[in-house]
Amino acid sequence: MINEKQYYATIDEMDAVLNAITYHGSKLIYVAGASASWKSFFNKKLQEALTAKGHRVLNISSDDYYTDLTNINFMLYGTFDHPHLIDYRGLQADIDTLFEKGKVKLPQYSFKERRTVSYRHIDTFNYDYVLVEWLYTINQLWNAHNPFKIFVDSHIEELIFRRLVRDQERVSEPLHDIVSMLGKVFPLWKVYGDGQREKWDMIVFNDYNILDAKGESYTLKKVDYKKSELGTLQKREYVNEFLYDDTHPGNGVVVVSEVYRDKYGFLDGVIVSKKNRNGDPRKFTEISMRINQPWFLTVIHTLLQTAGLRYIGREKRVESTYKNGDKEVTIKERAGEMFEKVAEDMKK
């Protein structure tokens, strides 16, 4: 359902966001979005933009409203991203107190200790704007004090890969654990967040593509080598690729690959990747991750289909790595043709 009264902007169009806030006329601004949508990044940029215009801004995060029961509820729901783990009523009560009495005591939650460790005392309400960063849910109490509600949106496959990359870098979790967690998070996101877009006053779209920052660019160059010219075979893998269409043209195809060392052997590993053609059918930018637990295949397929990506087909290829002196060559064979993978920084 489309709300014709909503404002729209991209994450880089801060002037449009500021104009919408000014026109709405509210002191209270809610910022929400799915996991890895960059809502925290946007919230920080919005605070900086308002401050640069001379406004005084108070920032409140729903992360500080996890409670001492969070660990118990985590065991119940299986994820920290479930909205029932956050004390939204307590947060709304503090917002009411701030606007009605001009002062409030705000909790400070420690993720390390997993408890509220202190309080921030606001004794005088001398702020022009109050920014509240939420998870992704709509609370029926939000209409109090005429809030301006901003939702940070993005393509679903982009959210998945940002989270996969971010969590591996941030907490060094195994890939299969991250995917298992996302398999719990995205159904919640569809129920509590995605289905309630029409309730937001403004949609801010994050069109950042992770391939631009993290992707490897390469060309598949058609070749006609004799096997004897390639040197010594180092590794050969037989690959079945399952393709999922992107939700937006040009944003990239998601590929889940079965990898076999023996053509008729057992599944050796699984690769999940996101790739995009760079205007040329043989030029690609790709980000990929591999895990050597075969059962991971079912988990990643379940995640992608739960998230709503459309399965579009299957392809087969053989990938071989040869070494000839100091030179290492990767050859991909598909449908009887051979292609050499040439990294962009190797090309003259």
Language-model-detected regions and their locations in the chain:
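Extreme N-terminal, non-catalytic leader segments
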Residues: 1-30
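The conserved Walker
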Residues: 35
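Conserved lysine of the Walker
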Residues: 39
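Hydrophobic positions on the alpha1 helix immediately C-terminal to the Walker A/P-loop
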Residues: 42, 46
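Conserved nucleotide-sensing/catalytic segment adjacent to the nucleotide-binding pocket
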Residues: 58-61, 67-115, 129
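ATP-dependent NMP and nucleoside kinases share a basic, alpha-helical "lid"
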Residues: 117-167
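Small-molecule kinase domains that catalyze NTP-dependent phosphoryl transfer to phosphate-bearing small molecules
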Residues: 139, 169-214
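N-terminal strand-loop-strand beta-hairpin
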Residues: 216-324
